[in-house]
Amino acid sequence: IGLVGSEMCIRDSCLIMDKVKDDIDKALFYVHQTVENGWSRSMLLNFISTDLYERQGKALTNFTKTLPDAMSDLAQELTKDPYNFAFTGITGRYNERLLKNALLNNITRFLIELGTGFAYVGKEYRLEIGETENFIDLLFYNLSLSCYVVVEVKIGKFAFADIGQLGGYVVACNHLLRKEGRDNPTIGLLICKEKDRIQAQYALESSSQPLGISEYDLEKFYPEKVEGTMPTIEEIEAKLRDN
């Protein structure tokens, strides 16, 4: 098996080739992600079934204008759109409190969905700004980026006001939590049920803080099955050598 088998088990290689048909680039994506992140077989199967290849790095952001080049590329890569929250088990009507509680009741799966390096800091995290108490929905620290990540969850459609609130929290974290020499600039991520892409892009352009906007989905979704011949071990190895 050569290059593939030397870093991941044959069973996982076969799983990728069985599930990802006629798309060498997609197969290589899952190979690289499995090796780099040490995914278990169940995690690999989950990310294939929820089509991570098509979702990763797809959030609308202003990172290229607000972060150093090296950090902006990695920050973008760590985003998803949409985020798959089917693991919450929520069906029917719900409110933001129910969704946030369901995310934290499944914190391990939530962290896996957020991506590499995310560590949970707190829910309704209190920030005293001047004489006012403010509460961040969810606060994380990303070890890969060495920065705090403010996550706001909205069950409705994106609104301009959401960016103003998120940007304010990001600035506050930089003043109150960030340590010079240890932490990179704080990033904000808004995860909403629906967004108008043009409106979201305009809102991002209006902010000087590094922010991203993504949607979430509560339903299980699977990649469209592609008919054709699956890539062979030799084809994958050849592509790896080319890269």
Please give the residue ranges for each predicted region.
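Acidic-basic catalytic patches of nuclease active cores, encompassing PD-(D/E)XK
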Residues: 91-122
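Single conserved hydrophobic/aromatic residue that forms the stacking wall/gate
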Residues: 1-5, 9-10
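Active-site metal-binding core of divalent-cation-utilizing nuclease and nuclease-like domains
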Residues: 116-144
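Interdomain/boundary linker segments immediately adjacent to catalytic/signaling cores
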Residues: 53-93
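Conserved catalytic cores of phosphodiester-cleaving nucleases, focusing on short active-site segments
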Residues: 103, 136-140, 147-155, 168-171, ...
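Nucleic-acid nuclease catalytic cores
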Residues: 154-155, 159-162, 173-206
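Polybasic (Lys/Arg-rich)
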Residues: 202-243
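Short, small/acidic-rich helices and loops at N termini and domain boundaries
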Residues: 29-36
